[in-house]
Structures are given as structure tokens and as C-alpha cells.
């Protein structure tokens, strides 16, 4: 069985402090060339898309262009997600031809660093060049219901570089070949992640046996997720987690530095998680707090009411 996506955290450090992004409590770390080579060998032939983050800003890693080239040569389709503030140091990426680059434009309003026009000029120069070389570029405004006052100005600045008409899509617009603008709601992280939640609890989550606590009412909910079937996550210390939302390593199933992927996926805890979702049950407290896993809700698409 081919897993669709693997999120490899090449660094867990970020240069911004966005209000919508949870804060992890792990030691700062980035992958070495040898570690990245080992991890990609472990999932080679078993994963289609390789994402270069789980937490952290991938453009901070000095070996990112080399990593993208290594991954492409091993047969992966490479995907980068960035806040777009460091694109001036990422021009070498244009020659590595990533499959897709996603830029989170909503990070600017959350941090208010520098002029929006300067930020967007950098974003659009890079994006149009990358799209021209064949990389799929996605400009994301995932802030509906949150800090979205700059959205209209962002769209006006985009139009300076890519004039209308734009082709409307269910989630936004196709601006031109290989360049898209995408809208969505403010993301809700599981486990009470995010700045507001961590401020209220001084960075500590309610615990039960070392894991996130869950409300008794959660047991009445129905859950479904394709974690471990369609996606996996790998933290910068090699820990394998079920999905891209386990930002703090609450559900560590094994370590790819020391174990094979098959061994980890065959473990009792991993099997229980997969089997639970087959019966619309969530065995892990983190999953019980995840909006994306609720059967009666859909994260993408319509606005939350």
C-alpha cells in the first residue's frame, strides 16, 4: 500500500510567532544530511508526496535545496510549505523544481513585520518565476473567521503582477498556469493548540497517563481519519507520528532512525489507531480533540457557522 503523504520535519524552528500556530515544547533541532538520507530511504517506494515540514519554517534549513534534489532523485514528489518571509534566500530552490510550494500569506497579518507591499512583491516575484518553471505555486489565505483584514489588499497587490480575469475555483482562483490563490477558514489545531490555548495554561496541557486529556462527551462522537493509511509524520528527532497535526509528539509510535516503517505501522498502538477509525472511534486523546477527525464536520470547504 502506497502512503499518499509523509511530513518530514527538517527543522522544528520558525522565524515567526503566528497566533494561529501552536507552540511545541520539544528541543530545537534540524536534520543533518545523513539523517535526511536515512529517513527518505526508510519511506522510499512507500510514500508518494514528501512534505518538508510538520512544525518549523523549512527555508531556515541551509540544506533545503540539496534535500529537495535528493528527494526528487529518490522518486518523491516534493512539497514545501512556507510563510514566505525568507524567499530572498530561496532562489536556489527554483532550479531544484519542487512539485509544489505553498505560501501562507496569512502569516503576514499575524506578525505585522514590514510593509505588506514589500512582502507581496517578494512573494509574487518568486511565485511567478517558480510557476514559469513548472512548480505548482499555491498562495494561501487560511484566515476566514480570524485575522483577515489584509485580504482585500493582498488580492489587489497580486493583481498588479497577475492581472484579472482569474478563473474561479471552489477554494479560490487559478491566477495563471501553475499559480493559485486559495482561501479557507482559520485552522483549529487539536489538543487546544495555538497561542491562546497555551497562554491560558502556561504551556501545559491537561494530562492523563502522559497524554492529552479528553472530555467524557468525546466518547459519543464519531471519528474517521486516514492517519497511518494516507499520511504519516516524522519529527526532527526521527519520531513517527500519525499525521501532520501531532505538532508536539503526543502520539509517538516509534522512531524511523532506529526502526523500519513496517515495524512501526505493525505495532499494537498503531494498529489500534487504524482499527479504531475503521469503527468510527478514536483511540488517542489527541484524535478525540481533532476537528478534522469528526465524521459530522468537514475542515475544508464551507465556512464554519
Question: Where are the regions that the model predicts?
Answer:
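N-terminal pre-core extensions flanking Radical SAM catalytic domains
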Residues: 1-27, 41, 202-203, 209, ...
Amino acid at each position: 500500500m502506497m502512503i499518499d503523504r509523509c511530513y518530514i520535519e527538517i527543522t522544528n524552528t520558525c522565524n515567526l510567532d503566528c497566533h494561529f500556530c501552536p507552540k511545541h515544547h520539544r528541543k530545537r533541532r534540524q536534520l543533518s544530511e545523513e539523517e535526511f538520507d536515512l529517513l527518505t530511504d526508510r519511506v522510499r517506494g512507500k510514500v508518494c508526496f514528501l512534505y518538508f515540514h510538520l512544525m518549523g519554517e523549512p527555508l531556515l534549513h541551509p540544506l533545503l535545496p540539496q534535500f529537495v534534489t535528493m528527494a526528487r532523485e529518490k522518486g518523491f514528489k516534493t512539497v514545501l510549505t512556507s510563510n514566505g518571509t525568507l524567499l530572498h534566500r530561496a532562489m536556489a530552490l527554483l532550479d531544484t523544481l519542487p512539485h509544489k510550494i505553498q505560501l501562507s500569506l496569512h502569516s503576514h497579518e499575524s506578525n505585522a513585520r514590514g510593509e505588506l507591499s514589500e512582502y507581496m512583491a517578494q512573494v509574487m516575484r518568486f511565485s511567478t518565476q517558480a510557476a514559469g518553471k513548472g512548480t505548482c505555486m499555491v498562495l494561501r489565505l487560511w484566515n476566514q473567521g480570524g485575522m483577515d483584514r489584509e485580504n482585500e489588499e493582498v488580492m489587489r497587490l497580486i493583481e498588479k503582477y497577475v492581472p484579472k480575469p482569474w478563473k474561479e475555483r471552489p477554494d479560490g482562483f487559478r491566477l495563471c498556469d501553475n499559480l493559485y490563490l486559495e482561501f479557507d477558514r482559520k485552522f483549529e489545531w487539536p489538543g487546544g493548540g495555538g497561542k491562546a490555548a497555551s497562554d491560558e495554561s502556561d504551556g501545559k496541557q491537561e494530562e492523563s497517563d502522559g497524554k492529552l486529556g479528553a472530555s467524557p462527551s468525546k466518547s459519543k462522537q464519531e471519528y474517521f481519519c486516514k492517519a497511518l493509511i494516507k499520511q504519516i509524520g516524522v519529527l526532527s528527532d526521527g519520531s513517527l507520528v500519525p499525521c501532520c497535526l501531532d505538532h508536539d509528539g503526543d502520539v509517538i509510535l516509534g522512531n524511523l532512525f532506529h526502526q523500519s516503517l513496517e515495524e512501526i505501522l505493525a505495532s499494537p498502538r498503531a494498529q489500534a489507531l487504524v482499527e479504531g477509525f475503521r469503527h468510527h472511534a478514536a483511540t488517542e486523546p489527541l484524535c478525540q480533540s481533532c476537528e478534522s477527525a469528526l465524521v459530522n464536520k468537514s475542515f475544508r470547504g464551507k465556512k464554519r457557522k
